[in-house]
Regions:
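Charged docking surfaces used in two-component/phosphorelay signaling
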Residues: 15-23
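Acidic catalytic/metal-coordinating carboxylates
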Residues: 33, 59-62
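Active-site residues of response regulator receiver
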Residues: 52
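Alpha4 helix (beta4-alpha4-beta5 surface) of REC/receiver domains from two-component response regulators
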Residues: 62, 84-101, 107-111
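The feature encodes the CheY-like receiver
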Residues: 14, 56, 65, 102
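Short amphipathic alpha-helix used as the core "switch/output" element in two-component signaling
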Residues: 61-72
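Short hydrophobic/Thr-rich beta-strand motif most characteristic of the beta2 strand and flanking loop
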Residues: 25-33, 40
Length: 120
């Protein structure tokens, strides 16, 4: 079973994504803040990460960039997303594999997840 880490401070979105992706057969781990991100990545070794940019206590772009600089985690695909304006250059610098604007259609999210996991 493939593992997905979802990091977002919006509890409603976390629940929706967890419920939807669980039904598709993925094992979901959720995190409601940026602190603890690296500990969770190390402990569960997710196959893909869905990461909000504007977390209450962290910037998802920075978390993504720091993770991708570590050889043990550089190949984990990351989908960054945000409801606010984000300059494209900062997304590119983060080394994220995909970017989405909230609100997004859950079908669009599942298609991107499947694509990055090589299932499509």
């Amino acid at each position: 079973m493939q593992k997905i880490l979802v990091v977002d401070d919006d509890k409603d979105l976390l629940e929706m994504v967890e419920m939807t992706l669980s039904r598709l057969g993925y094992h979901i781990t959720t995190l409601a803040k940026g602190s603890g991100f690296f500990n969770v990545v190390e402990s569960i070794r997710p196959d893909i990460i869905l990461l909000d940019i504007f977390l209450g206590d962290a910037d998802g772009r920075i978390l993504c960039n720091k993770m991708k600089l570590q050889s043990a985690y550089e190949n984990i695909p990351v989908i960054l997303y945000s409801a606010g304006y984000v300059p494209l250059s900062t997304i590119e610098h983060s080394k994220a594999d995909e970017f989405m604007i909230k609100p997004f259609e859950i079908k669009q999210l599942t298609e991107k997840v499947k694509k990055l996991l090589g299932l499509q």
